[in-house]
Amino acid sequence: MATVHLPIRQLVEFLLRTGSIDSRFTGFDRALEGAHIHRKLQKAAGDGYQAEVFLSVERQAEGITFTLEGRADGIFTDETGTVVIDEIKTTAVPPEEITEDMNPCHWAQGMVYGAIYAAQQSLPELNVRLTYYQIDTDQIIRFIRRFTQQELDEFLDKLLCQYAPWAQRRIEWDVKRTQSLAALQFPFAQYRPGQRAMAGEIYRACRAGKTADCKGGTRLFCQAPTGIGKTMSALFPALKAMGEGNGEKLFYLTARNTTQTAAEDALTRLHTAQPELALRSVTLTAKEKVCLHPDAEGHPACLPELCPYANGYYDRIKDALTALLDGTGSFDRAALAGAAKRFSVCPFELGLDLSEWCDVVIGDYNYLFDPVVHLKRFFDSSGDWLFLVDEAHNLPDRARAMYSARFCKSSLTEAKRALGKGKSALKTALTKADKALLEARKACIQLAPRHSSQTDAADPAQTSLLPENTVPALELPEPLYAQDSTVFLQEPPSALLSPLRAVQAPLQDWLEANPDAEAHAQLLELYFAVQDITRAAERYDSHFVTQLTARGRELELQLLCLDPAPFVDASLAAGRSAALFSATLAPPSFYRSVLGCSDARAVALDSPFPAENLGLYCLPNISTRYRDREASVQAVSDALARLVQARTGNYFAFFPSYAYLRQVHEDFAARYPGIRTLVQESRLDDAARAEFLAQFVPDPAETLLGFGVMGGIFGEGVDLAGSRLIGCAIVGVGLPQVNPQQEMLRRYYDAQNGFGFDYAYRYPGMNKVLQAAGRVIRTPEDRGAVLLLDDRFAQQEYIRLFPPHWRHIRYLRSCEELAAALQDFWNK
């Protein structure tokens, strides 16, 4: 008999939920405040009240064994000796509109818990109590119904019989999919060099899974240079492992949309090579990008009265799923949009609902790692999931950003102005919070006066200490570090967080009472900003610091996650195994440390391309340190000219900053006007990015030199194969700009392991260097030249970070030697 694991809430909501998507402001964060209220009510219930009781049972229906699991909010025995199952719900519905039958799902959930508990405890009957907590009035409204064990059993059996056709569909598909994947063949005639090795590593990691002596399943770091075919080398073995019963679902997580497209293309290749392949996939895209009915400002308007795709969504979604799940499907962005129009359902929510029925889910990192937007339907508990994390070198910075939060004082000032004249509870709360942040701004200026000069990472500005006999305007804790109008504290001051928390309730009231006000959108944005900072305060621990920065009249408060390791570790622990891969994951000790995978296996594969196809040169007589940049401009221009004059073609020059890029470009364009150039501008959208890259045509009649920024949109994730790019120059070692935040990061890791400069500057910088250099040579037939410009490339601290296929680097003493070496390379 087939077995289906089914969370109780999922069973109830799938069958009984009706109506529309409605994302209007409801006055509270359901997940966070709801949990707080649950704990508050559970604690107030007394000693005999059992909170969060885990219940599990196996039940048969229609020839299927269902394993049901869930947590009852509370179980207790009342004064009459009757057992009561308590189901707690927080709501913004006005008290007078809260009725006994306003949501059938609520009763159903309590009744299923009651059926399980009554059977396990041999209870002839029990009570189910709905406890509604009205968040605006703090009013508690309760409804109680008595059920016999027979009534509860019959109700549960009815639900399972209704769900059985869907379960049978899942069972039949799982069998078909597993058999199909077991017979899956590699879609190419042969493996590329290194491809079989990478595939083998990932296959073994997926098979080992939870049996490994490693927290949360097996972890693997794989550095795979350009050309190995990382996407197929990861997907194919993971799918083969699934075909052997190792993993229920595969999540392919990326940092960029271009990488998602690569995963979609790889799956299409598998389907083309094996048309009978039974495999479903879905690509999850941000709501703003897939919305079919945005408002006048281009934002999703997820209200039933405004959007036909939101109106009645839950009444139509099962019909849509029935039709879409009849066969194999790859639901990318275009396919979801087409299906959404066909069935008149929201494409974003359709993608989420389809993900439960798909074998491969492709999406951004945030769907797993972000504490706010992660896929709760999967990752609120662990499962037999396989995680493939592409471009994993991007994950440390992305993770830090996900767990951090930022708040600006100006948002309070602007909110007060938007409210106009007159007194109100909201204005009073805004004024108090604004005043608290104003005092903090004064304290920042006193603790860390601004310095106008910038320095190098190797020679940072000195800490600015509080002058003697000076009393700060606000009593802040002893700072960890203070510089350039920025103060870092070990703990967030309650003098700032308390008034911000106090803003929430009156702000909620105002938003609910004034849905059509002109200032509603602005104050809603403020509400979410306050919510973000209070959420971050909930998870704040020793891996965070508080950053206060004064800029003019602005005060910026950040709860800054310096070390995301425990949070990334906890996210990965939700799955069976995780393979994190990139062309640049060196040194592995750094990535294992900052991503919480200390026990992970790490492998580095050799480049599949012949070393002689890459001309690799360095001019170590140029310093691009910040203090030397102005003096280096002409030398850099001359070196770039020698690089591109050696052979007609397309080239890129990558710089550590826009300012330095513009300095060199101005000089280069003036002194070498015969060479065509393109300059990367900041904040390019997708269309402008595509237009820029379209200039890099195959076999050009004239040379083109693009000026770009390391770590930017052209410095990685760009595939210009063949003659579309035959060379690049890397100007500098890519160190992040020296600023108080980077210095705090350095100090943190100095205290943790003594490698602060490496963790904050050198390793991230060299990662950008290697990514940029990897734009050259994309296929075995490509030939190209890479020029490194900086004396630090000749230092052992940097040489030890070079990949194995850079062993043949040549250090040259002048532009004349460079020209001769390039001529020799291209003539071979």
State what each model feature region is:
Residues A234, T261, K341-V360, Y365-A502, ...:
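Signature of the SF2 helicase/ATPase Hel1-core->accessory helical subdomain module
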Residues L336-V361, P371-F378, P506-S623, A631-V633, ...:
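A contiguous, basic/glycine-rich beta-loop/short-helix subdomain that forms a polymer-engagement track
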Residues W173-Q223:
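Conserved pre-motif I regulatory segment
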Residues P656-E681:
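Conserved helicase motor "Helicase C" RecA-like lobe of SF1/SF2 P-loop NTPases
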Residues T178, Q185, N246-V361, F369, ...:
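A substrate-engagement module of RecA-like helicase motors
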Residues V57-E154:
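Mg2+/Mn2+-dependent nuclease catalytic core
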Residues M1-D78, T82, A108:
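Metal-dependent nuclease catalytic cores that hydrolyze phosphodiester bonds in DNA/RNA
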Residues P620-A631, S682-F793:
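Conserved RecA-like P-loop NTPase helicase motor core
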